[in-house]
């Protein structure tokens, strides 16, 4: 969660094992941590299962979904995850399939019943591949089909204002944006320059 009240207008929140580890949180407090986030966020909150088998992921998913009405269960895009996603979605539990890096993965996630699919942008850039192009391919491919349920694409691993811009242009439904990048999205040097000029001109009016 952000330390700024401005973040209260963000539509969706995400967690994953790495983000939680960075908080220094304890395993025993993880569920309480998710509950606290859900209490302050009006929209969906993605909470990730760390299980590796179908049955264990389903068990985790049910436990996470029981924490709050706005929990979305995050599941890695893998064979066991696809099977668990199908089962959970049939129970009415929304799933966000994460760690998606290809069009075939995204299509299979949607067919399994995933409500959200999270292709990672920044991690492609880390290995000198174009993450935005990969995101565009996923968006285009998923939009080609009617899966019989709503599917939204989350641009994940977004690291800059340019990533946000490109994700919007490519048609991603949602972007997960760290607070530092979110602040940069609001800032522009011409805005600062214009505001400075306005204030100086207003001072002249006051002194007239």
What do these predicted ranges mean?
Residues 1-7, 11:
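Single conserved hydrophobic/aromatic residue that forms the stacking wall/gate
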Residues 8, 56-60, 104-111, 159-172:
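Catalytic cores of alpha/beta
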Residues 16, 73, 109, 167, ...:
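Conserved, mostly hydrophobic/aromatic
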Residues 31-45, 82-91, 132-149, 200-201:
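Alpha-helix-loop-beta-strand connector modules within alpha/beta enzyme cores
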Residues 46-52, 70-79, 94-107, 118-128, ...:
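Catalytic beta/alpha-barrel core
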């Amino acid at each position: 969660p952000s330390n700024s009240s401005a973040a209260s207008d963000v539509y969706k929140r995400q967690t994953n094992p790495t983000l939680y580890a960075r908080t220094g949180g304890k395993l025993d407090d993880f569920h309480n941590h998710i509950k606290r986030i859900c209490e302050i966020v009006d929209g969906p909150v993605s909470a990730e299962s760390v299980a590796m088998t179908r049955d264990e992921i389903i068990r985790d998913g049910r436990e996470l979904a029981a924490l709050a009405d706005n929990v979305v269960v995050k599941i890695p895009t893998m064979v066991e995850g696809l099977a668990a996603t199908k089962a959970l979605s049939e129970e009415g539990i929304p799933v966000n399939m994460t760690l998606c890096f290809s069009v075939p993965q995204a299509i299979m996630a949607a067919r399994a019943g995933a409500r959200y699919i999270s292709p990672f942008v920044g991690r492609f850039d880390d290995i000198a591949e174009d993450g935005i192009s990969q995101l565009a391919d996923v968006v285009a491919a998923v939009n080609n089909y009617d899966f019989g349920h709503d599917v939204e694409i989350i641009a994940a691993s977004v690291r800059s204002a340019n990533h946000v811009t490109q994700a919007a242009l490519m048609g991603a439904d949602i972007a997960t944006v760290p607070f530092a990048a979110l602040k940069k999205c609001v800032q522009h040097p011409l805005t600062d320059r214009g505001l400075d000029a306005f204030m100086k001109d207003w001072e002249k009016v006051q002194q007239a």
